[in-house]
């Protein structure tokens, strides 16, 4: 990553004034990523129901007016941030996740398309019959159909 190609993070939100933005996944086009994040902020804030977002952009919760109900502080599928099937804590995590979804009346789980984030972070824990996958320009969205 060439840090001289970074651009002011205040283009994402004024609270990020003084910081510079560049990401290894958008190292040649940080403005493209910022455009995606700004469009995402609008989409997320206009959602009129409770959502959960699985993303590496954990700061989004602090720059939107929407509670994004992150289930974890990080997201990996190697068992480090959430137990994988076969792990002795898998059922405990599954119960934690389902309880959080029910308690917060989550209606959908969002994944940024460009992150190529494994959707197993939700599909491994919720019965496939309870999920309906849809998408828009920026997100894969799993509507939760039967957890009330």
Task: Walk through the language-model features, giving the residues of each.
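Short periplasmic/luminal acceptor-recognition loop of GT-C membrane glycosyltransferases, typified by
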Residues: 3-78, 107-117
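Compositionally biased amphipathic helical and low-complexity segments enriched in hydrophobic
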Residues: 38, 99, 146-148
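Periplasmic/luminal catalytic loop of GT-C fold multi-pass membrane glycosyltransferases
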Residues: 55, 59-63, 79-138
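Binuclear metal-ion centers of metallo-dependent hydrolases, dominated by the metallo-beta-lactamase
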Residues: 136-147
């Amino acid at each position: 990553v060439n840090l001289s190609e970074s651009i002011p993070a205040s283009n994402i939100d004024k609270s990020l004034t003084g910081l510079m933005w560049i990401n290894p996944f958008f190292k040649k086009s940080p403005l493209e990523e910022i455009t995606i994040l700004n469009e995402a902020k609008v989409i997320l804030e206009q959602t009129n129901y409770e959502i959960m977002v699985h993303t590496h952009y954990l700061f989004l919760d602090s720059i939107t007016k929407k509670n994004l109900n992150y289930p974890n502080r990080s997201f990996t599928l190697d068992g480090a941030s959430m137990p994988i099937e076969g792990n002795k804590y898998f059922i405990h995590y599954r119960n934690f996740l389902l309880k959080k979804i029910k308690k917060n009346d989550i209606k959908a789980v969002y994944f940024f398309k460009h992150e190529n984030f494994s959707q197993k972070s939700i599909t491994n824990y919720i019965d496939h019959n309870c999920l309906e996958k849809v998408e828009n320009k920026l997100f894969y969205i799993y509507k939760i159909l039967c957890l009330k």
